[in-house]
């Protein structure tokens, strides 16, 4: 994220060179930085390429993160099906899912695909980076909303948001996750 902000700020500074303030109309500096950051994100939605030991490290972090999300979601599934759900266990699992989901955008830089090592991440992730990034953002949002529902303690709301989170996971996994090896 810091890289995108820096790129956006650089884009703003370069685009502003030689222009007087009144030439900018009513576009604020904030909106110009946001536009630059958005353009930078669109140009490289999965981040900068990595290789070697760094690629292997990211792949390991990705694998462990996804395993942890899966383990936490198993707790959620068990509890929401229970006649007497343990909301505390759901809250803990939801917080873990949300925390990890917010990190997931950095788990798929170019150079961490199936040609590098064992992974269930399909090559299509890097062939369709904008679609993948959009699905990842939807997952992050669903995880955030699920966590908010868990904090509320309302089991019906928790169940509804768990369904939405499951759909977000499935949308990405159906397109971008290979079967187990």
Language-model-derived ranges and their functions:
Residues 11, 163-166:
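Processing junctions and N-termini across compartments
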Residues 1-8, 22:
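Sec-dependent signal peptide recognition
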Residues 23, 178-179:
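Short, non-ligating residues that shape and space the ligands of small metal-coordination modules
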Residues 14-16:
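C-terminal motif of bacterial Sec signal peptides marking the signal peptidase cleavage site
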Residues 165-177:
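The canonical Cys-X-X-Cys-His
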Residues 18-26:
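Bacterial lipoprotein signal-peptidase II cleavage site
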Residues 39-164, 179-181:
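Extracytoplasmic c-type cytochrome modules immediately beyond a signal peptide or single-pass transmembrane anchor
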């Amino acid at each position: 994220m810091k890289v995108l902000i820096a790129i956006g700020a650089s884009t703003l500074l370069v685009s502003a060179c030689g222009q007087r303030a009144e030439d900018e109309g009513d576009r604020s500096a904030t909106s110009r930085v946001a536009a630059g950051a958005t353009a930078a994100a669109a140009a490289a939605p999965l981040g900068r390429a990595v290789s070697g030991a760094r690629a292997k490290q990211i792949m390991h972090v990705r694998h462990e993160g996804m395993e942890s999300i899966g383990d936490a979601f198993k707790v959620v599934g068990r509890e929401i099906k229970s006649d007497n759900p343990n909301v505390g266990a759901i809250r803990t699992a939801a917080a873990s899912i949300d925390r990890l989901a917010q990190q997931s955008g950095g788990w798929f830089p170019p150079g961490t695909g199936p040609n590098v090592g064992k992974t269930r991440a399909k090559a299509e992730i890097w062939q369709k980076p904008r679609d993948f990034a959009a699905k990842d953002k939807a997952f992050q949002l669903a995880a955030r909303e699920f966590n908010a529902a868990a904090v509320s303690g309302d089991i019906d709301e928790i169940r509804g948001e768990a369904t939405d989170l499951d759909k977000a996971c499935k949308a990405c996994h159906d397109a971008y996750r290979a079967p187990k090896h």
